[in-house]
Regions:
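Hydrophobic alpha-helical transmembrane segments
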Residues: 1-125
Length: 125
């Protein structure tokens, strides 16, 4: 079981990096700060769908329903974490030139990583 847990955590990290830093469009970035914006939600939906994919890859199709549950949790949490970060930066006018922008980006990424630790924890309880 520990190999599966480790594999899931690694794949969630790779999935997160790819969707957040390689695949994300400018429209998705702009939409994340507007609550329930379809394009901003699409970004988080891709994260949730990616979680379903990697969980199914690790645990197999017999656990498809569990994969859907943790994918949905990831979608909801990812959306709200991103929305909060975008609105904090917007409210205070933080841009990439401001160290507080980077502090909030770091907090955003930490929250996503804690989400993945929580999702992995759900696989072992």
């Amino acid at each position: 079981m520990s190999n599966y847990v480790f594999a899931l955590l690694i794949l969630l990290q790779i999935k997160h990096w790819y969707i957040d830093f390689v695949d994300q469009t400018e429209a998705e970035v702009a939409g994340k700060g507007i609550y329930l914006n379809a394009v901003g939600m699409w970004h988080s939906f891709k994260q949730g769908l990616g979680t379903v994919f990697v969980s199914t890859l690790v645990f197999g199709l017999d656990y498809w329903f569990f994969s859907l549950i943790i994918g949905f949790i990831d979608f909801v949490l990812h959306y709200h974490i991103d929305w909060a970060k975008m609105n904090i930066n917007k409210k205070y006018g933080y841009t990439i030139e401001n160290p507080k922008f980077w502090a909030w980006l770091g907090a955003d990424q930490m929250a996503h990583q804690l989400t993945y630790i929580g999702l992995v924890w759900l696989t072992v309880v």
